Every structure is written in C-alpha cells, then in structure tokens.
Amino acid sequence: MFDGRNSGHSSFSSRGDGMHTPEHELAGHAAPSTRRGKQNRRSDMEVMKERFAKLLLGEDMSGGGTGETSALALSNAITKLADSMFGEQMKLQPMYPETKENWRKEMGWLLSVIDHIVQFVPSRQMGKNGQFTEIMVTKQRDDLLTNIPALRKLDSVLLETLDNFKDQKDFWYVPRDMEDADHNGDWRRDENWWLPVVKVPTDGLSEESRRWLQNQKDSVAQVLKAATAINAHVLSEMHVPENYIDSLPKNGKTSLGDFLYKSITEESFDPDYFVSFLDLSTEHKVLDLKNRIEASMVIWKRKMCQKEKDGKSQWGSTVSLEKRELFEVRAETILVMLKQQFPGIPQSSLEVSKIKNNKDVGQAILESYSRVLESLASKIMSRIEDVLEADRLVQRQLMGEAETRSESEAESEYEETEKVVAAETPNSRKLSDFIGWRLSSDTKKHSSMSDIEFFHKVEQEKEKPMMKSPRALPKKFSYLAKLENMRSPSDRH
C-alpha cells in the first residue's frame, strides 16, 4: 500500500535522472525526525494519560476509593514535580534544556485544569430583533485569572536568572570531599554540608561582578516577596479544619505561654525588639513560635466571631473585642517578620492542616505553585549569598594581610631610621655632658664606671669638704646658760 499525498494519486516521486523512487523509501530516508516527533508526542500523551489517571484516582491505583481528594492530589503532583526538577539545583547555573522543557510541559498539563474552573457572571446579548437580553456566561474565576499569569511570570524570571549564570567565570564550585582534607572533616558540622564549596579569585570578585550579583539577588528577592504574598493570601482564604480547632486550647494565653502572652498584650509593643529578643537560633524554635502564634490567632478570631454573633463568647473572657483585635494585629505582624527573616521556614501545623483538608482545586493549584516558586527563589538567593559571603571572606583576609604588612613595614622603617641616626652621630654624648660636668684628671680613671655610679660618687666627694670636724666648731652659749652663771648674792653672815 502506497501513500499518494504528494501528487494526486501518484505513488512515485520523480528524480532528476528520470528514474522514479517509491514514496515509502523517501519516507524511510527523508523523514526520521518526523517519526521521532510523532513518537515523542505519542509518549507525551501516554505520560499525560497516566498522570491524570493517578490524579483522578487520588493516587489510589487500586480504585478502592481510599485515595486523596483531587485538590490534594494536584497539590502533591506540583510539589513532587518541583522536587524532581529543582531538588538538585545546588549551584548557580542554568537548568539543563531537557529539565527546563519537562518542567514547562508538565506544569502546563497540571495548570490546564484551571481552564475549566469558571464562574457565572451576568452579561448582555443582542437578540435578532436588536434588543439586549441579560444572560449568564462563564468566566475564569477571578483569583485564578489574576494570580496564574503572575505566577507564570515569576516562574520565567527565576529561570532567566539561572540562565544569566551561563557564561560566568568569576566564581566556581569545589566538591566538599576536596575541602575535607584541608579542614580535617570540620565541614560536616556545617548545616549545608551537602552543598559544594564556592571559590572566588584570590583577590576577590571585581566591583562589576559584585554589583551584578547584588542586582540578581535583588531581582530574586522581589520574586520571593511576590510569591510569598500570593501564598499567604491563598492560605488565609482556606477554611480552618475542624480537627485543627478541636486540638486547640481554650485561650490564647495557654497557647502562647506566659512570657509571649505578656509581651504581646503589653501597652507598649515593639515588634522589632520582640523578635530580636527571642531565641530563634534553630529552625525548630522558629517553627514552634510560628505554631504558637497561629494557634492563638485562630482562637482570638473564633472568639471575636462568636461574640459578634451571640453577643458573648461561648468560652467566656474578660478581654474586650478591641483589645483582642489589637493582639491579633500584633501577632500577624510577628508572623510576617518571621517569614521575611526566615524565608525557607517549613510549613506550620495550621498550614499543613489546611492543605490536607482543602477541597478547592483552584486554591490547591495556587497554593502549591506559589509555594514551589517561593522555595526556588529562596534557594537561588541562598546560593547568591554564598558567593557574596565567600567574596567577603577573601576581602577580610586581604585586609588582615594588608594590616599585618603595614605594621611590619612600619617597624622596619623605624629600625632603619634608628640605624641611620646612629650612623650619623657616632660619638654619642653621655649624661655628664648634658649636666655640664668636666672630668678632671683624677676622675678619668673612673671612666669605666657608668654615668649614674659616677654621679653618686662625685656628689659624695662634694659633701666631704663641707663637713668640718667637731673640734673646729665654735662653742655656742645659750641665754639660759648665761642666766645660770648669774647667781643671786649669798647671805653674808
């Protein structure tokens, strides 16, 4: 059977020598790429069918009905896809072309679901008679219509940022096992011990490279900020599960603890001072603080809603509605600061509970997509900061060497100056020359003495002629002695 698509019903193709070649031979030699393209499309279709079959069954291929909800299945699919694509992104380098293509292709499959998440909106339609009639038409949901294009743009910015490091030669990476010999295995104590070590030139990065890296970091920081905002907004719109509410204590003070509750409920509250005063040295402590604050916020919100509904709280409380709103604002401010200070912090108990119990497919897609972009942006920022930190370390070493060299040069200059002065004045004057002494012939024999010893000896010789013998001193008579010689006349009898 032949294919006659080229020229009517002809089964042959003409050649320049007048001979004819069967069409199937041309297909075998001239279109291998076409066959490969068809095979790729067929394999893509098979992969997509398998992927969506798992999603429809909730990852339960047995069909027993024990699978996850569609929302959670989509959320997990996006999370697993991002882990497989970006999990090995340990260096500042472009993604492999195949990896990038697979990421965009499979994300396109998963995001195609949102085309069917619509809402009814009123519209006007002109009839045949020229009159307008109000009808209801479908439109993509507002949150998806706004946030999905924004997330796609953030996705493209992050991939372009990685592509910008394609031809850079200002820094490079060394495996950790090579550093092990130099540091005697101390690198395993580092929290990121699995990452390769960044190396920069011995004189550090150039000023141009440093500015370029800082610009890349600022760009990624904007992406991180936008993705975090979208993720936080979507999570705030999700319903709080009942099983999470049942696990909460009766009041926010019990959830926070005495110290945190007293700090948040004081009259004067400074969030910056409060966060700086806390012990946030480990990831576990940060996550524990986040869980406590979120639990107290849920408790306060429920009490406020119950008080507005019934006029009083079912749990009973002496705290006014206005103060509870103020406490909630303060707690939310602390949460925002924690997310900004620790962008890679794990999900809290409330967030995990919301994601697991969520049944809105659109919210599940928005939350998971923004979360994986937030994680990728945080990872890229951390890799850029590693390069800048390596450069700062080299700069500090150079400054220390320069200071040491300047001190040694100053000491050597001082020593050379002393030598020059000593060479110019060979006959140095002694202490006796400055005082004005003149050595006589009698004292020249003592020239071997030191100046201080000679000084004391001369002073003793000066004092000797001034001391006269006691015999040479004139006898002194006191006034009382004179009176003693003048006695009263004795009686003459």
Curated annotation (Swiss-Prot):
Keyword flag Acyltransferase: no
Disordered: annotated span: 1-45, 400-423
Domain PRONE: 35-401
Source species, domain of life: Eukaryota
Organism: Arabidopsis thaliana
Biased composition (Basic and acidic residues): 17-27
Name of this chain's protein: Rop guanine nucleotide exchange factor 10
Alphabetized GO MF terms: guanyl-nucleotide exchange factor activity
Domain remark from Swiss-Prot or TrEMBL: The PRONE (plant-specific Rop nucleotide exchanger) domain is responsible for the GEF activity.
InterPro entries linked to this entry: PRONE_dom, RopGEF
Cited function: Guanine-nucleotide exchange factor (GEF) that acts as an activator of Rop (Rho of plants) GTPases by promoting the exchange of GDP for GTP.
Any one GO CC term of the record: apical plasma membrane
Key words, A-Z: Guanine-nucleotide releasing factor
